[in-house]
Curated annotation (Swiss-Prot):
InterPro entries: DiS_bond_form_DsbB/BdbC, Disulphide_bond_form_DsbB, DsbB, DsbB-like_sf. This is Disulfide bond formation protein B. It comes from the Bacteria. It is a multi-pass membrane protein. The keyword Electron transport applies. Disulfide bonds join 34-37, 94-122. Belongs to the DsbB family. It comes from Herminiimonas arsenicoxydans.
Length: 158
């Protein structure tokens, strides 16, 4: 039987590294996160948490965890896709005002404001990183992570 634990640890590590990159961009490069960015951060955090918790359980639980984390990744991909659409159509609003958002009143945002507080606007343009915008990179990573997790969750037992 193949072990899901290495994949879950790798995905958790990748998700935590992506959150670290987000913190670097926010605090060093002064790229303020918008509400959609923060929702994507929640998705990466959920993926990491689910993977870490279920990696220490039985193989069946690890596979269930991989499926749940894949759902979180697909949800994050949906948010990233919406964010890309908004950036491509500046007249469209994300519908979330960062100054009045209930997103900033969630207990985790109060506990970790340096990571989960939305201060920027969804349509703010920042310089691309290696040719892609931040939401485009997030979408790429959400898809890659989802593919690994779906393969782990649904592969045949050997």
């Amino acid at each position: 039987m193949k072990n899901s634990r290495p994949v879950l640890f790798a995905v958790a590590l990748a998700s935590l590294l992506l959150l670290a990159v987000a913190l670097y961009l926010q605090h060093v490069e002064n790229m303020l996160p918008c509400p959609l960015c923060v929702i994507q951060r929640y998705a990466f955090a959920a993926i990491a948490l689910i993977c870490l918790v279920t990696a220490f359980r039985t193989e069946v639980t690890a596979r269930i965890g991989a499926a749940l984390a894949a759902l979180a990744s697909l949800a994050g991909a949906g948010v990233a896709g919406w964010h890309i659409y908004i950036k491509a159509h500046p007249t469209v609003s994300c519908g979330i005002d960062p100054l009045e958002t209930s997103l900033n009143t969630i207990p985790t945002a109060k506990l970790l404001p340096f990571l989960l507080q939305a201060d920027g606007l969804c349509t703010t343009e920042y310089a691309p990183i290696m040719g892609l915008s931040i939401p485009q990179w997030a979408l790429v990573w959400f898809i890659v992570i989802a593919l690994f997790l779906l393969h782990t969750a649904f592969r045949k037992k050997s």
